[in-house]
C-alpha cells in the first residue's frame, strides 16, 4: 500500500507527532516512520498526553513507549490535570492536550495530528449544532497556525476505514479507549449513532461535509481580505479596538470586525449572543460606567473608548508580600508573574534597616518624579492612563512604609537614586 498521508504538507524536517496510541495516531506515526526512511534528514518525536481519566492510562503509556522504542522515535509523556471550571470533560481534555503540545514543541518543529475525514464530518456537525457561522463551519484546516509554528493534519482527506485497512495490512496494534463507546459525549454520539445512519443513506456524506467546510473556509478567508482595512483602522497598536469607527457600521459588519479582533487575541469564537452583549453591554454602556463582560477565564472591558480583551485577575489591594531576599526574584500571588531589582536604573537600593515588600495599594498623598505636588494613587493612575483593572494588580515597591515605585509606571521622589548605583524594578508578567 502507498502512503495515505498528504506528503505535500510535510515541508518541515522537524516533526512532533501527537500520539495517543489509538488507531489514527498509530497509523500516522507508522506512515511518518516510513516517510523518514525515505527522507533521512527528517527528525521525528512523539508526545503522549496522560489525562488521568482512565484506569488504563498507565498501561497506555507503556504501550506507546514500546511502540516508539520499536520504531526508534523519542517519546515525551506529559501528565496533565483537568481543573478548568466551566468546561466539559471533552473540552478540558482537549485544552490540556494542546497546552501540553505547545509546551513540548522545540524551535523549528511542527505539530502533526491524526484527524481524518470522519473527524472532519463530526466537527462540522458539532459546529452546526452550535449554530456556528462560516468560521465555525470551516471545521479543521489541513494547515493552521499553532504556538508560533504550524499544526498539520496530513490524514484529513482519508477516512477511518482507509486507516484501518492500513493498520491491518501492516499488522499494527493499537489501544481502544473505552470512553470512545460512551455516547453521552457529543462527539461519540455523532460517531456511534448519527454519522453511520447518514453514511448508510448517503455513502459520500462525509466527503460532502468536507467540501462544505472547505467552501465555508474560502468564504471566511475572503471576508478576512475584504475587512482587513476596516480592522486595521479600528485596532490600536496596543491591540485594543476603537469603538468610534464602528458606530456607523451595520450590525453584521461590526460583528465581523469584533470576531476578527477576538481571533487576533487567540480568544474562543464568541456566540452571536455574546457579540450582541459585547456591543450593547460593554461598548455602549454609560460613559461613567466601567463595563465588564466575562467570557470564560477572560474579560472584555471598555476604557478610553476602546475595547480590551484581558485575562481575569483577582484584585490584590489587601495583599502584602515581604521580600526578605530582595537580591533574588520575588514570585507574585495570583499568577501575576515575578518582580526583581536589577542593577542600573533610577531607583535607590534599600538601606540595611529598610524592610522591602511589594504591595498593591498606597495611602496618602504621593510625590512622583515628573509631577509637582502630592496626589492620591487613584489620581496618579488616572493621569497616567493606567486601566482600572491594572490598578490593584500592578506591583508597588515599598521600603518600610514608604512607596518607592510602581513597576513600569513611576518612581516616587523618595525612591530616586543618587549617584550611579541605582536599580530597576522589573516586572515579568505571566498574564496578559
From Swiss-Prot:
Binding site for ATP: 20-25
One Pfam family, short name: TilS
InterPro entries: Lysidine-tRNA-synth_C, Rossmann-like_a/b/a_fold, TilS/TtcA_N, tRNA_Ile_lys_synt, tRNA_Ile_lys_synt_N, tRNA_Ile_lys_synt_subst-bd
Protein name as it appears in the record: tRNA(Ile)-lysidine synthase
Gene that encodes it: tilS
EC number, UniProt record: 6.3.4.19
UniProt entry keywords in alphabetical sequence: ATP-binding, Cytoplasm, Ligase, Nucleotide-binding, tRNA processing
Species of origin: Shigella flexneri
Gene Ontology molecular functions: ATP binding; tRNA(Ile)-lysidine synthase activity
Main location: cytoplasm
Domain of life: Bacteria
Similarity section: Belongs to the tRNA(Ile)-lysidine synthase family.
Cellular localization per UniProt: Cytoplasm
Name of the top EC class for this enzyme: ligase
Taxonomic lineage of the native organism: Bacteria, Pseudomonadati, Pseudomonadota, Gammaproteobacteria, Enterobacterales
Catalysed reaction, written as an equation: cytidine(34) in tRNA(Ile2) + L-lysine + ATP = lysidine(34) in tRNA(Ile2) + AMP + diphosphate + H(+)
PANTHER family: TRNA(ILE)-LYSIDINE SYNTHASE-RELATED (PTHR43033:SF1)
Matches recorded under SMART domains: TilS_C (SM00977)
GO CC terms of this entry: cytoplasm
GO biological process, one term: tRNA modification
Domain notes: The N-terminal region contains the highly conserved SGGXDS motif, predicted to be a P-loop motif involved in ATP binding.
Keyword Ribosomal protein recorded: no
Protein purpose: Ligates lysine onto the cytidine present at position 34 of the AUA codon-specific tRNA(Ile) that contains the anticodon CAU, in an ATP-dependent manner. Cytidine is converted to lysidine, thus changing the amino acid specificity of the tRNA from methionine to isoleucine.
HAMAP family: tRNA_Ile_lys_synt
Amino acid at each position: 500500500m502507498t502512503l495515505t498521508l498528504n506528503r505535500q504538507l510535510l515541508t518541515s524536517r522537524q516533526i512532533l507527532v501527537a500520539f495517543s496510541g489509538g488507531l489514527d495516531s498509530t497509523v500516522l506515526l507508522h506512515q511518518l516512520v516510513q516517510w523518514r526512511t525515505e527522507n533521512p534528514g527528517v527528525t521525528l518525536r512523539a508526545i503522549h498526553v496522560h489525562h488521568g481519566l482512565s484506569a488504563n492510562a498507565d498501561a497506555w503509556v507503556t504501550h506507546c513507549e514500546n511502540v516508539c522504542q520499536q520504531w526508534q522515535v523519542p517519546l515525551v509523556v506529559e501528565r496533565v490535570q483537568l481543573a478548568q471550571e466551566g468546561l466539559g470533560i471533552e473540552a478540558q481534555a482537549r485544552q490540556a492536550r494542546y497546552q501540553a503540545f505547545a509546551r513540548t514543541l522545540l524551535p523549528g518543529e511542527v505539530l502533526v495530528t491524526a484527524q481524518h475525514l470522519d473527524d472532519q464530518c463530526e466537527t462540522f456537525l458539532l459546529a452546526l449544532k452550535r449554530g456556528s457561522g462560516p468560521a465555525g463551519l470551516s471545521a479543521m484546516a489541513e494547515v493552521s497556525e499553532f504556538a508560533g509554528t504550524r499544526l498539520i493534519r496530513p490524514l484529513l482527506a482519508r477516512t477511518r476505514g482507509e486507516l484501518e485497512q492500513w493498520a491491518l495490512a501492516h499488522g499494527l496494534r493499537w489501544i481502544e479507549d473505552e470512553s470512545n463507546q460512551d455516547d453521552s459525549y457529543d462527539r461519540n454520539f455523532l460517531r456511534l449513532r448519527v454519522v453511520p445512519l447518514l453514511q448508510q443513506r448517503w455513502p459520500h456524506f462525509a466527503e460532502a461535509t468536507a467540501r462544505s467546510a472547505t467552501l465555508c473556509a474560502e468564504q471566511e478567508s475572503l471576508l478576512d481580505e475584504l475587512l482587513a482595512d476596516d480592522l486595521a483602522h479600528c485596532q490600536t497598536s496596543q491591540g485594543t479596538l476603537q469603538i468610534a469607527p464602528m458606530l456607523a457600521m451595520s450590525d453584521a459588519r461590526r460583528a465581523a470586525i469584533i470576531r476578527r479582533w477576538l481571533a487576533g487575541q487567540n480568544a474562543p469564537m464568541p456566540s452571536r449572543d455574546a457579540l450582541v452583549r459585547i456591543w450593547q453591554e460593554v461598548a455602549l454602556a454609560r460613559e461613567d460606567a466601567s463595563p465588564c463582560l466575562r467570557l470564560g477565564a477572560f474579560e472584555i472591558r471598555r476604557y478610553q473608548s476602546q475595547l480590551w480583551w484581558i485575562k481575569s485577575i483577582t484584585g490584590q489591594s489587601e495583599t502584602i508580600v515581604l521580600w526578605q531576599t530582595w537580591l533574588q526574584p520575588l514570585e507574585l500571588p495570583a499568577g501575576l508573574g515575578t518582580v526583581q531589582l536589577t542593577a542600573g536604573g533610577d531607583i535607590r537600593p534599600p538601606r540595611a534597616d529598610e524592610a522591602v515588600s511589594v504591595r498593591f495599594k498606597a495611602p496618602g498623598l504621593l510625590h512622583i518624579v515628573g509631577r509637582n505636588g502630592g496626589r492620591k494613587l487613584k489620581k496618579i493612575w488616572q493621569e497616567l492612563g493606567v486601566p482600572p483593572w491594572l490598578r490593584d494588580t500592578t506591583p508597588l515597591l515599598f521600603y518600610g512604609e514608604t512607596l518607592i515605585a510602581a513597576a513600569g509606571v513611576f518612581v516616587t521622589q523618595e525612591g530616586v537614586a543618587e549617584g550611579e548605583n541605582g536599580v530597576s524594578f522589573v516586572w515579568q508578567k505571566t498574564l496578559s
